[in-house]
A protein has these predicted regions:
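Short Gly/aromatic-enriched secondary-structure transition segments
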Residues: 55-64, 120-126, 204-208
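Active-site-proximal polar cores
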Residues: 571
Length: 612
C-alpha cells in the first residue's frame, strides 16, 4: 500500500508541474470575453456548510456565505491594513456614549430586501426595526444561537429577562419593548448595555447581526430558515445541493453601491487594487458557485484545470510544491497565477471536555493528565510534517492580528517534552499495571483517550501525529470519525471527550480567543466547558476596559490560567495563502471581512485568452 501511495503522489506531482493552461470542460462550456458571457466566480470549500441563518450557524464556512446575503450595519474596508470598520447599511459609524454603553446607529434609506413571497409582491425596505428583531432572534431559545454568548456577555439591557421567560416554555415575546435594543425612528436604532463594551461595534460589522425580515422568519420554521436566506446583501441563493454545491446570483434589487475602499499609505498591493477598482458599481460578478471538495488533490486540480478561479486555503500537503521556500512556484508564476499570504487570525487546538469523567475536572490528577497530554504532543511534527511550515506554534489562544497578542510571550503550551509528560503521569498514578503497554487510571480503571475526528486527508494525517505522540508516553488514544457538522453539534452538546478544531476570529480583538474559556459560554464558544471562577473574573473585567496596559495585564493573567489548567492544547496560528488565476481581479485575503464576492471581478477576456 505504501508503494502505491508513493507512486500516486509522484504521478500527481509530475502532472501538476506539467499541466498546461487548458480549459476544463466546465470552463470551456461557459461563454467568455466579447461574446457577452456572464462573469462567474467558482471555488471550493474543504468543509461542508451547515446552513444560512445568521442566528443558527457559527462555522467559518457558513459564515462566509451568510456575509454575502445578509447585511450587518457596519463592515470592514476590504483593502485597508490594518483593518478598519466602515459603514455598511448605516449612514455613518455609530454614535457611542463616552462610557461605551450606548450605540446609536442611523441607517441609509432606500435599501431593500431581495424579492420573496413573504413580502406579497411589495418591495420591502430595510428599517431600524429589522435590526432590533434580528438581535432579539439570537435570544430566542428555539434557534440555539451559537452567538448568544456575545450578546449575553455584553449585557444588553432587558433581553436576558425575555429569554428567561421563553426558556421556561413561553412563546418568545418579540414585541415587548426593552431598553437594551429599540428603534428610535424608522431608520435609527439604539443598543444600550449594562456595562461598558468599548469594542461592541466590531459585532455590528459581523454577519451574525445581518438583518432578517420578520415576515420571512414567520413564514418558515427554524430548520427551514437554514435553507431559505433572504437578505439585503449583494447575492441571493438560487441552488443548493447540500454538502456538494451552492449557487448564488446577483440580487437584482441590490442598492446603489460603488467601490470606495481606501488602501493604507505604503501598502502597494492595496493601492493597486483600490486604484483599479475605484468607482465601479458593486457587485461585479454575476454568479458565484461554491463547491464542497474535502480532499486536497481534487480541489487543487480543479484550480489548475481552470474549473475554479481561486483557492483560498492552499492544501498543506501540497505547500512545498505550491510555495517552495515561501515563494510561489515558478511554473505557477509563468501561468500568471498570483498569491496573497498572511496570518489568519485563528488558533488550532485540541479541546478536553472538562465535564468528562476521564479528562475533565480541576483536581491535581486531572490537570496532570491534560498537561501530560499537552507535553507529549509534538507541535513541531504537526507544523513541519502536516502543515508544511504554514503555521507558528501557539503559546496561548490569542492570535496575531488581534489585540492581546504578544509575540514575546512564551509558555509551556508549545513545549514538547515526553520525559516530563511521563514523569507527571507516573507521579499521579497513571501507570501500566497489567503490562499491556498502556497506562491505566490511578484507580486501575481503563484509560483510553477518545478523540473525535473527520474522515478527510488532513484529519487522518493529524490523527497519526497524535497517535505517535501519545504512544511515546504509553497513552492509548482512539479516533472516532464523523462529518465536521456532526462533530460540531456533539461538541456544543458536551458529548465529546476530545476534539481538534480551529477557532477563527471575526474581529481584530483577542477577546474572541479568551471567550473559549469563559464559563457562561459553555456549549457556545467554550467547547471545553471550562468553568473556573478566577478565569471568569479576569475575562469579565477585561471586556469592560479600553485597550491599554490594564487590559493587557488581564490578557496575560488569562493566558497563564489557560496554560496552568490546560482545558485546551493550543497548537498553532495558521499562515494561510490564497492563489488565484490572472483573470481574478481585485482579490485580497481579508481576516475579518467575509463578504468578499462583491469586491472581485472575473475578466472573461483574460480567461478566454489563457484558456484558448
Amino acid at each position: 500500500m505504501t508503494k502505491r501511495v508513493s507512486k500516486s503522489r509522484r504521478a500527481f506531482t509530475k502532472s501538476m508541474l506539467a499541466l498546461p493552461a487548458a480549459a476544463s470542460s466546465a470552463a470551456s462550456a461557459q461563454p467568455v470575453g466579447a461574446n457577452g458571457g456572464p462573469k462567474v466566480l467558482r471555488y471550493a470549500f474543504r468543509v461542508a456548510e451547515t446552513g444560512f441563518d445568521p442566528a443558527q450557524v457559527q462555522d467559518f464556512y457558513s459564515a462566509n456565505i451568510i456575509a454575502n446575503i445578509f447585511d450587518p450595519p457596519l463592515t470592514y474596508d476590504f483593502v485597508a491594513r490594518p483593518t478598519k470598520v466602515v459603514p455598511n447599511t448605516a449612514a455613518a459609524l455609530p454614535e457611542i456614549s463616552p462610557d461605551f454603553t450606548e450605540f446609536t446607529i442611523r441607517l441609509r434609506p432606500g435599501i431593500y430586501f431581495q424579492e420573496h413571497a413573504a413580502f406579497k409582491g411589495k418591495r420591502r425596505e430595510l428599517v431600524a426595526q429589522d435590526y432590533v428583531y434580528s438581535v432579539k432572534r439570537h435570544y430566542n431559545p428555539k434557534f440555539k444561537s451559537p452567538r448568544i454568548y456575545l450578546l449575553e456577555t455584553s449585557k444588553v439591557l432587558g433581553m436576558p429577562e425575555i429569554r428567561a421567560v421563553a426558556m421556561k416554555g413561553a412563546k418568545f415575546d418579540y414585541d415587548r419593548e426593552v431598553e437594551g435594543v429599540r428603534a428610535l425612528d424608522r431608520y435609527t436604532f439604539r443598543i444600550k448595555l449594562a456595562e461598558p463594551a468599548p469594542r461592541f461595534q466590531f459585532y455590528l460589522a459581523d454577519s451574525w447581526l445581518g438583518a432578517v425580515a420578520r415576515e420571512v422568519d414567520e413564514m418558515y420554521d427554524d430548520k427551514e430558515m437554514l435553507a431559505n436566506p433572504v437578505g439585503t446583501g449583494p447575492y441571493r441563493l438560487v441552488d443548493w445541493r447540500r454538502s456538494s454545491r451552492m449557487v448564488f446570483e446577483k440580487n437584482p434589487g441590490y442598492r446603489d453601491d460603488v467601490y470606495q475602499e481606501q488602501a493604507t499609505p505604503g501598502d502597494a498591493r492595496g493601492q493597486e487594487i483600490a486604484a483599479r477598482m475605484k468607482g465601479r458599481r458593486l457587485p461585479i460578478v454575476d454568479r458565484v458557485e461554491v463547491y464542497i471538495i474535502e480532499e486536497n488533490q481534487p480541489r487543487w486540480l480543479a484550480f489548475l484545470n481552470g474549473e475554479h478561479d481561486l483557492v483560498e486555503e492552499i492544501p498543506y500537503d501540497l505547500a512545498n510544491l505550491i510555495v517552495p521556500n515561501g515563494k510561489l512556484a515558478p511554473n505557477l508564476v509563468k501561468r500568471g497565477i498570483r498569491i496573497d499570504r498572511d496570518y489568519r487570525a485563528s488558533v488550532d487546538m485540541a479541546l478536553f471536555n472538562m465535564e468528562h469523567p476521564i479528562v475533565g475536572g480541576h483536581t491535581p490528577d486531572k490537570v496532570a493528565l491534560r498537561r501530560a497530554v499537552g507535553l507529549a504532543y509534538s507541535i513541531d511534527n504537526e507544523i513541519r510534517l502536516v502543515r508544511k511550515g504554514q503555521s507558528i506554534p501557539s503559546e496561548s489562544p490569542v492570535s496575531p492580528q488581534t489585540s492581546g497578542y504578544d509575540p514575546a510571550f512564551k509558555s509551556e503550551m508549545s513545549d514538547h517534552d515526553p520525559a516530563q509528560a511521563k514523569a507527571l503521569l507516573d507521579s499521579f498514578g497513571y501507570l501500566d499495571r497489567d503490562g499491556d503497554g498502556w497506562r491505566e487510571l490511578p484507580d486501575g480503571g481503563r484509560l483510553v483517550l477518545q478523540m473525535a475526528t473527520q474522515p478527510d486527508q488532513l484529519s487522518r494525517q493529524l490523527d497519526e501525529i497524535w497517535r505517535k505522540s501519545m504512544s511515546a508516553v504509553n497513552l492509548n488514544i482512539q479516533f472516532q470519525p464523523a462529518k465536521w457538522p456532526e462533530n460540531l453539534k456533539n461538541s456544543r452538546a458536551g458529548k465529546l471527550m476530545m476534539w481538534r478544531v480551529g477557532w477563527v476570529a471575526a474581529q481584530p480583538d483577542g477577546d474572541t480567543f479568551l471567550a473559549l474559556g469563559y464559563g457562561p459560554n459553555k456549549g457556545q464558544a467554550n467547547h471545553a466547558r471550562f468553568d473556573l471562577p478566577a478565569f471568569n473574573k479576569v475575562y469579565a473585567r477585561q471586556r469592560t476596559l479600553p485597550d491599554g496596559p490594564e487590559r493587557e495585564a488581564l490578557f496575560l493573567e488569562a493566558k497563564k490560567l489557560f496554560v496552568a489548567y490546560m482545558p485546551y492544547k493550543f497548537v498553532g496560528h495558521r499562515i494561510e495563502a490564497a492563489v488565484f488565476h490572472p483573470w481574478v481581479v481585485g482579490y485580497r485575503r481579508q481576516s475579518f471581512l467575509r463578504s468578499l464576492w462583491k469586491y472581485v471581478d472575473i475578466d472573461n477576456d483574460v480567461k478566454g485568452e489563457r484558456n484558448a
